[in-house]
Amino acid sequence: MRRILFFWIVTVVIANPVFVGAQNFSDRFAKGNTSFGGELGFGHTFNLPPGKDRTDLSFAFIFPNWQKNLTGIIAPDSLMQGALYWHVEAGLALLTHRDHEYLIGFSPLMVNYKFLNSQRKWAPNILVGAGFSMQDCEEVAHYELGSEFQFLLHGGVGVELFRESGTYSFNYWLFHVSNAGIEKPNIGLNSHVFTLGFRF
């Protein structure tokens, strides 16, 4: 299965032409440009901080998003050359191997920095931000989640692959869910999330 997935990824990366020939580098990453996209992936909870064993939960991660370039190309001709994006997303985390309990989230306070280079057709990126959600997982994770309303914290890294039209990305996120002490208990859940993203 891993070999098939690896082969598919390599095919996607190689089969399409580099974006630079179709569109000027600075135009593509101009300040004010916007795009829609999405993240599809899988997550699993883990013990952070270490201590009492947390509830084991696995979930599908389905989050459409919107981005706006806030800066255009900054720090030119340096290792930090890139662009800062406002990132807004809303979507669904659906538990697997349970009764399909869910979390519906909205995160309007996120930023994504892409390390850009006109000689590459890919860019590493960093994403951080916050949002809020409603969920019905408190019965299966009562020790960690004491209320339906929860806050969300996101932090992650990825690699974005540029195509003539649109992009693909491969990402890792740390996904934190807690209610900030509104109700007890408030241990919270932390998850590793791996996603495949796309933009158009």
Language-model features and meaning:
Residues 65-69, 76, 112-116, 150, ...:
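Transmembrane beta-barrel domains of outer membrane proteins
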Residues 19-69, 192, 197-199:
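Short glycine/proline- and aromatic-enriched beta-strand/turn motifs that initiate or cap beta-hairpins
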Residues 1-30:
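Cleavable N-terminal export/targeting peptides
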Residues 34-40, 82-90, 122-130, 168-170, ...:
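Transmembrane beta-strands of outer-membrane beta-barrel proteins
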Residues 21-34, 70-84, 116-124, 163-167:
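Short loop/turn motifs that connect adjacent beta-strands in outer-membrane beta-barrel proteins
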Residues 49-52, 95-97, 139-145, 179-184:
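Extracellular loop and loop/strand-boundary signature of outer-membrane beta-barrel proteins
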Residues 40-46, 68, 90-96, 130-136, ...:
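Transmembrane beta-strands of outer-membrane beta-barrel pores
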Residues 32-34, 56-62, 100-107, 122, ...:
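Residues that define the transmembrane beta-barrel architecture of outer-membrane proteins
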